[in-house]
Regions:
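N-terminal "arm"/small-domain region of PLP-dependent enzymes with the aminotransferase-like
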Residues: 1-31, 36
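PLP-dependent aminotransferase-like
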Residues: 69-158, 165
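Short beta-strand segments
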Residues: 5-7, 58, 131
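Phosphate-binding glycine-rich loop
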Residues: 31-78, 91-96, 101-104
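Solvent-exposed, non-membrane alpha-helical residues enriched in polar/charged side chains
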Residues: 20, 24, 42-46, 66-69, ...
């Protein structure tokens, strides 16, 4: 018997009518790029997260790349990333011209291992990009302390943990 890796049809079928009706409504509304639907999403998602603001972007890769660009990350820089993550994490670093430096995960959480972060820091390291996986936040107290001790930026990727709470 073949077991599918990921059955998106099964996940989609129970909510297909609702999703398709919303897509059709938005498509028929006209201004769906930077329009009222985006503003509605940003407000609702910020409320869900308990955040004062939210910026809706095309995808997580764009969000990570913009964050790294805002930090001034570029050629010659290194960014510490989890070895266990979606490819967008590494691509965002590469698209800025920097080098992703992989760190293995902790066996108990599958999130980036702070001890591995310490070992991976070089004179070219500019940032740490932890990814909160499977709804489980990374050890941010330790990661923030490491970053502060080495004067590094931290850019958190929460694309796989929407709504998760740390502590």
């Amino acid at each position: 018997m073949k077991v599918p890796f990921l059955n998106l049809e099964a996940a989609h079928s129970s909510i297909a009518a609702e999703i398709e009706a919303e897509l059709l409504r938005v498509a028929r509304s006209g201004p769906y790029v930077l329009g009222p639907e985006l503003e509605r999403f940003e407000t609702a998602f910020a409320d869900y997260l308990g955040a004062p603001h939210c910026a809706g972007l095309a995808n997580g890769l764009d969000a990570l790349r913009l964050g790294l660009m805002a930090m001034g990350i570029g050629p010659g820089d290194e960014v510490i990333v989890p070895a266990n993550t979606y490819i967008a994490t590494w691509l965002a670093v590469s698209q800025c011209g920097a080098t992703p430096v992989p760190v293995e995960p902790r066996e108990d959480t599958y999130n980036i291992d702070p001890d591995g972060i310490r070992a991976a820091i070089t004179e070219r390291t500019r940032a740490i990009l932890p990814v909160h996986l499977y709804g489980q936040p990374a050890d941010m107290d330790t990661i923030e302390a490491i970053a502060e001790a080495h004067d590094l930026w931290v850019l958190e990727d929460g694309a796989q943990a929407h709504g998760a709470r740390y502590k």
